[in-house]
Amino acid sequence: MKVDIDTSDKLYADAWLGFKGTDWKNEINVRDFIQHNYTPYEGDESFLAEATPATTELWEKVMEGIRIENATHAPVDFDTNIATTITAHDAGYINQPLEKIVGLQTDAPLKRALHPFGGINMIKSSFHAYGREMDSEFEYLFTDLRKTHNQGVFDVYSPDMLRCRKSGVLTGLPDGYGRGRIIGDYRRVALYGISYLVRERELQFADLQSRLEKGEDLEATIRLREELAEHRHALLQIQEMAAKYGFDISRPAQNAQEAVQWLYFAYLAAVKSQNGGAMSLGRTASFLDIYIERDFKAGVLNEQQAQELIDHFIMKIRMVRFLRTPEFDSLFSGDPIWATEVIGGMGLDGRTLVTKNSFRYLHTLHTMGPAPEPNLTILWSEELPIAFKKYAAQVSIVTSSLQYENDDLMRTDFNSDDYAIACCVSPMVIGKQMQFFGARANLAKTLLYAINGGVDEKLKIQVGPKTAPLMDDVLDYDKVMDSLDHFMDWLAVQYISALNIIHYMHDKYSYEASLMALHDRDVYRTMACGIAGLSVATDSLSAIKYARVKPIRDENGLAVDFEIDGEYPQYGNNDERVDSIACDLVERFMKKIKALPTYRNAVPTQSILTITSNVVYGQKTGNTPDGRRAGTPFAPGANPMHGRDRKGAVASLTSVAKLPFTYAKDGISYTFSIVPAALGKEDPVRKTNLVGLLDGYFHHEADVEGGQHLNVNVMNREMLLDAIEHPEKYPNLTIRVSGYAVRFNALTREQQQDVISRTFTQAL
């Protein structure tokens, strides 16, 4: 919508001095601004500058708190009676005179806020876990006076849904905390200023008057008008919050420091007001590079100052914290917030979107050391400049802090070069698309239900529909598949029904006004489902098909263990016999999900992703027909089961790359660990070989999708074993797990052991 603001006014003319293009001035269109003004960079990293003394001093101050967190597995501090909002806290600083970019979630570094609107129970559990008492008035307010998202969901859940939740056939549902996975276009605040954005919402609100008076789609129209009003209110709150730090963000940013600061204030408002499971940053590096390059040309900024701006911005992202429970940590370990920033990629016009600022973002892993946040994600294309490819490979080899995603696949699929990644692997066009996050369904447990007639093998209660159990002495593949298909139908209904409830209630009681204010009015919504236990279910079905699997039953006839006679092909070795089973399961479940009605007509998608919940899923799932023992962790994401991918890196990568993105458009996570020696004896060879692996895995053409996502760890198992025994020697040791990075010291002992038990590829 065209915005009727006089952009010839001095405030806008000064801010946009030297910027090319006109469409983006008349209506909100950040992509158009970028395409007209960014400077592609095809050189190497030799221009980069070291950290300033201020950066080093500030980061050491932050690290003091992080060391306390690592040692205690507890927050440094948290509020006791303030319900956080965008404006709830006064300004907070690390050391104000040294900070080029300012702003904290609360009034002190690493102090955590209370987010009661998603649910009071998680906060109560946190108080109990960390030895504090909740203020009685605060508890009364959010129990009796102000209904929360969590209360709304559990008021409406069915008994079947509650049993699915208890058994672990559905796990990680966002029914007690913020759903997240929404990416505000935080760049809009820097480019346009708050006044421009507020005016757009006022015009859009007025535009609905006729529809309202005619009674057209009445409930949806009223809801949209209320949401637009909330957007306007949230934008003004962001302006008020920034004023506490001495900044007037009603106008556009006029220089690089203001552009970084304005953008960060927009993101800060999001993490002040929501505790979503994933609070992604978006695609900011090349946008900010435009301002930095303009300041370079004006002679008001040099390279070290530019790096300092980025360092201080990234430092603030590294400090974002939410108050979580130990139970949450068992699912999503190590305080992840998934502040995912995508870097690189190619434009639709064939130009690379790599800029010098792309290098600066990666360089923060040197200036301040490795860190899990922000979740730095390389959008990989075979056409990326070779110097950037090699630099990214070098950063991975040294820090194990990067993940890679297939730009050639997703750019083509979206027909957009302005998309980003929500959480770990979920692509969406920035400002035009949002996601209803849906956690994941346990396919391995579903297979056991298919064998046992819907009885849970751990709880010994009826969870699925009551059907005749499969009582053959040797499991018959066709019968098992028929039964599994029936139970997948049932699971899809329970899953989508639960998600419809969750997202209705989240919109009602914990709406993300500050994030949605930075979207177009009419957004494309997806309902993001997920699969866990894919490799367990796949190998189990392969064993049933190609070997002889005999159920071992308890006194009630329940299959509680399995005896395998013979060998069977295992997923992860580029064997079509078993890889085709994995592909079928992905396609089969997606088609069942897609057939069901969804809240707000969201388009169903699914991911193959577990985060660190692969450990909890293993705990909740009994012995499986592939020979996996009860309690043993699942493989993460789309990974082959630990130790079963025996034919080297290329075979394992090839198996995973076969999984159809067409039926898993919420992403397919693969975590790849390789010992340094397998990549080569010297650094130049290692970089070249890693670049070659990435090019091969992500290769995309008309008939070949290519892999979608790859975590890369380059390290020896022996180092991780030493880190368990001597954590003080490795304060910043960062590893990639399923879809994100985490400080190794922040994992539980069980999760550390799970990481160590995974395949470390010894050869290409």
Swiss-Prot record:
GO terms for molecular function: 2-ketobutyrate formate-lyase activity; formate C-acetyltransferase activity. The modification Glycine radical is found at G739. Keywords: Acyltransferase, Cytoplasm, Organic radical, Transferase. One of its GO terms (cellular component) is cytoplasm. GO terms for biological process: carbohydrate metabolic process; L-threonine catabolic process to propionate. It catalyses: 2-oxobutanoate + CoA = propanoyl-CoA + formate; formate + acetyl-CoA = pyruvate + CoA. Residues 636-764 form the Glycine radical domain. The keyword Lipid metabolism does not apply. It comes from the Bacteria. Its EC number is 2.3.1.-, 2.3.1.54. Dependent on PFL-activase. Belongs to the glycyl radical enzyme (GRE) family. PFL subfamily. This is PFL-like enzyme TdcE. It comes from Escherichia coli (strain K12). The gene is tdcE.
